[in-house]
Every structure is written in structure tokens, then in C-alpha cells.
């Protein structure tokens, strides 16, 4: 058993992680942080060590490895096979239906009436949920559009939902949510837009999105730092609680690319702790984390 002094000395050296079940040295964390930044743009500071430890440990166990150093070596030599698992492990997927409700109110009260008036000929609406996580955001968009366009015939409405994490993209495609993920929804919305199903665990309740909502959405994996295959432009882009993991230069590049992908006067919605101030001048602020492209 380590003495108290030994533990203090280890903490002082920054290598207290070396005494855990699966040792992780500073060099291991530095490699993981560097790889995360290279492949995804995500910045992992030292304060993220606990989080990274708990997430990568699952991969170490599944691969029957003994240390983080072994995992780092494995990742170096098996990048094609392991990189997707690595990225899935380090990404954060916190979301809920109608999160930041004022965004959906603005969409319903301001954006949709404007688009109905402006796109009378094409009758097209194109929206991108960038960083869609497990699908709550794009399905919230679909519910909003389905309700708002119920009296408007012939509209072609499509939501592109993308994320870096293949697991959450699959979850979104499936569209099944356990009870606690829908607890905040009014009973009327639940009844209108979900079908009760047997959860995979066989315990409790689960709800699947109705087919009339699934038809609006296309789920795809996409690394925001890679080339984008989309050809057409969007009326609205939601990119919320994504850029907080990027440095300022990466944020600027990303927001400028979003501006290029938006139609004239298109709308960008970002997360509550994010801002475009000091990052790009291609948008004007319309209120709390809501922006319009300057055309």
C-alpha cells in the first residue's frame, strides 16, 4: 500500500494516474490529446484526464490490454481499425429534446413564417443539425416543422443530421428513447409523435419516433474538420455545444464554412456557452445565441 507521502509525491509529479488499475502516464495522455486534436479538432486539457481515463479504460478492457501505453501503441499500429472506436470514446454527447427552448420558439415564430413567405416557389426547407448526438435535436426540429407546416401543402422539408460518433448516429437512425429521455415532454407531444415499444433491456418503457418524423431526417457520420460532401445550401444550421471543444482558429474556420453553406440571410443557432464575438464577422446577432448570415 502506498504511504500518504508517496501519494502526495505522485500527485506533485502529475503521475497519480500511474497507480490506478490501468496505469496512464503523462506521455500517454499527451499522445491521446494530440491524436484527438489531429483527428477531430477537440482540445483536451489536463483537467480532462479523469474523463479520458474512464472512457479509454473501456477500450483497454475490451482489447485485453494492461496499460494506457499499450493502448497508445495499439492505436498507432491499428489506426484504420481503432480510430472510430477512439473517436467515439472521447466525444461528449449530452442532449435532450427541445434543449434551449428559446431556439425553437424563435424558429417557430420568426424563421418559419419568413421561409414560408420567401420560398413560395421552391417550397423547400433545408436544415442541418451539425453535431446531432443521439438525435434529440433533429427530431425536435422535425416535430417543430411538422406542426408548423401542417396547413402548408407540397413543402419539401429535409433535415441533415450529422455527428462524428458512429454510435450516436446509429442511435438517431433507430430513434428509440428510454423513459427518462422523454420525461420532460408533454403527454400530448409524446402521444402525437412517439410509439411505445419494448426497450432493448426488456425493462421499463421506451418510445420510438413515429415514421412521419423519421422521414424528414437523414443521419450521417461526418467529421466537421473534413471535406463536406453536401452540394446544396441550407436555410438554417444548428451547431450547438460543439465548438466549445475547439480552439479559436478552428472555430473561425468552422463558422466561416457554415456561412458559405448558408443561403443569403440564413440562420445559425449555437450553444448557450458559445459566441461568435471575436471569432467571425460574417454573422449578425439576433439575440441569445441566434445569428443571421450577413449577405
PLM features: residue spans?
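A short glycine-rich, Lys/Arg-flanked "PGG" loop and its adjoining helix->strand segment in the class I
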Residues: 252-264
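Conserved SAM-binding loop of SAM-dependent methyltransferases across substrates and taxa
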Residues: 134-152
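Conserved beta-strand signature within the Rossmann-like core of class I S-adenosyl-L-methionine
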Residues: 265-272
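Conserved AdoMet
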Residues: 2-128
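Extended basic-aromatic, gly/pro-enriched interface segments that bind polyanionic ligands
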Residues: 151, 155-238, 242-246, 250, ...
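Class I S-adenosyl-L-methionine
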Residues: 273-295
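Conserved class I S-adenosyl-L-methionine
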Residues: 123-135, 158-160
Amino acid at each position: 500500500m502506498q504511504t500518504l507521502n508517496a501519494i502526495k509525491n505522485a500527485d506533485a509529479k502529475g503521475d497519480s494516474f500511474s497507480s490506478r488499475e490501468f496505469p496512464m502516464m503523462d506521455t500517454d495522455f499527451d499522445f491521446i490529446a494530440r491524436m484527438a486534436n489531429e483527428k477531430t479538432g477537440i482540445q483536451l486539457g489536463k483537467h480532462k484526464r479523469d474523463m479520458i481515463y474512464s472512457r479509454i479504460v473501456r477500450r483497454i478492457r475490451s482489447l485485453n490490454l494492461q496499460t494506457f501505453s499499450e493502448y497508445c501503441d495499439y492505436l498507432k499500429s491499428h489506426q484504420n481499425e481503432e480510430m472510430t472506436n477512439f473517436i467515439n470514446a472521447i466525444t461528449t454527447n449530452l442532449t435532450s429534446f427541445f434543449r434551449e427552448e428559446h431556439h425553437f420558439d424563435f424558429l417557430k415564430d420568426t424563421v418559419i413564417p419568413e421561409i414560408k413567405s420567401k420560398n413560395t416557389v421552391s417550397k423547400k426547407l433545408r436544415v442541418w443539425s451539425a453535431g446531432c448526438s443521439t438525435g434529440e435535436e433533429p427530431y425536435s426540429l422535425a416535430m417543430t416543422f411538422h406542426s408548423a407546416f401542417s396547413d402548408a401543402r407540397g413543402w419539401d422539408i429535409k433535415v441533415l443530421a450529422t455527428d462524428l460518433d458512429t454510435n450516436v448516429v446509429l442511435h438517431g437512425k433507430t430513434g428509440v428513447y428510454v423513459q427518462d429521455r422523454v420525461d420532460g415532454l408533454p403527454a400530448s407531444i409524446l402521444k402525437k409523435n412517439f410509439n411505445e415499444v419494448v426497450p432493448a433491456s426488456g425493462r421499463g418503457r421506451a418510445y420510438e419516433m413515429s415514421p412521419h418524423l423519421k422521414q424528414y431526417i437523414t443521419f450521417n457520420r461526418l467529421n466537421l474538420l473534413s471535406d463536406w460532401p453536401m452540394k446544396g445550401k441550407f436555410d438554417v444550421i444548428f451547431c450547438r455545444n460543439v465548438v466549445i471543444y475547439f480552439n479559436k482558429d478552428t472555430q473561425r474556420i468552422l463558422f466561416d464554412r457554415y456561412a458559405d453553406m448558408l443561403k443569403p440571410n440564413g440562420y445559425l443557432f449555437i450553444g448557450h456557452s458559445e459566441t461568435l464575438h471575436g471569432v467571425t464577422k460574417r454573422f449578425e446577432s439576433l439575440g441569445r445565441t441566434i445569428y443571421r448570415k450577413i449577405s
